[in-house]
Design a protein with these regions (language model features):
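Repeated scaffold domains used in trafficking and secretory/extracellular systems
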Residues: 69-70, 79, 107-117, 149-161, ...
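A short loop-to-beta-strand structural motif that recurs across blades of beta-propeller domains
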Residues: 129-131, 181-183, 225-227, 263-265
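Short, solvent-exposed loop/turn segments at conserved positions within beta-propeller repeat blades
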Residues: 124-125, 173-179, 218-223
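Bacterial signal peptide processing site
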Residues: 14-16
């Protein structure tokens, strides 16, 4: 079995402060007053109508039950060329020890593994819900719920690009139907766009590089891979076999640093 406690120590590896003040998990939970699916959360209660009015928060439940593999037609995407530069046994070490030695970090806030960010948004897991805030305004735009194992409600496991939400639905355990896949969901039109095949993703985070998603899958007695998915269709366009399951991925410049259960990989991306 995978020693998840080893991974959790990487929590201190992320950025702890932001340029603006955001609600933490407890204050988020306290500020939400749900009255059903149509309930809204207004960040600035004093804002009136007009330019200063905060947008209504959209509450969306993404139902993935019975949704099989979906790949719409889309432009072909060339995968990145991934070349293993180094492969080192780590003695089942703590992930943060290796990342700190490389002066790397994940875009995290705090130490609870529930708060991360990108250039446009901040993402906060609170209970079963994912809150998405706009960096510039601090407004909460979306509150999303979708099925995924609580082991995986951490890391950088969500991404919003042009109103399209990219997420992971994971089951912690051996391979089984309808588990460990990525999906893309149109939040404005409440529509699933694609759903990758089973057993394509159970990494604790994924990376978006232009038109490619880098993620990975593996488990005890199963083969372990890094996968590249077409961002627009969810199709696997390339794979790279590793010796152990990839769990955390950190890109820096043209290098990808991959921590696994018992190996550390440095991979060149071209």
């Amino acid at each position: 079995m995978i020693v998840w406690t080893c991974l959790l120590t990487l929590a201190g590896c992320g950025k702890k402060d932001m340029d603006y003040t955001m609600q933490n998990e407890s204050s988020v939970a306290e500020s939400v007053r749900e009255t059903g699916e149509e309930s809204v959360l207004i960040q600035n209660e004093d804002a009136g109508e007009g330019e200063n009015a905060a947008p209504e928060t959209k509450y969306i439940t993404i139902d993935l039950s019975g949704v099989g593999e979906i790949h719409p037609k889309g432009d072909a995407v060339l995968p990145l060329t991934l070349k293993i530069v180094s492969e080192e046994e780590n003695g089942i070490d703590f992930a943060n020890e290796w990342y700190e030695s490389k002066q790397l970090s994940l875009p995290m806030v705090g130490k609870e593994w529930n708060n991360f960010y990108d250039d446009e948004y901040q993402y906060i897991w609170s209970g079963d819900a994912l809150y998405i805030y706009e960096n510039i305004s601090g407004n909460c735009l979306y509150v999303l719920e979708y099925p995924t194992d609580k082991w995986y409600i951490n890391g950088n496991n969500a991404c919003l690009l042009d109103d399209i939400f990219y997420g992971i639905s994971v089951t912690n355990g051996y391979a089984q139907p309808d588990s460990c896949f990525m999906f893309a969901y149109d939040l404005e039109n409440n529509k699933i766009l694609w759903r990758s095949g089973d057993q394509t993703c159970n990494t604790m985070n994924f990376i978006v590089k232009k038109d490619v998603i880098i993620c990975g899958y593996g488990f005890t007695s199963e083969k372990d891979y890094l996968y590249q998915l077409n961002l627009h269709t969810g199709e696997v366009i390339a794979s790279l076999e590793l010796k152990k399951q990839p769990d955390l991925l950190v890109p820096q410049d043209n290098m990808l640093y991959v921590h696994t259960y018992s190996y550390n990989y440095t991979i060149e991306m071209q």
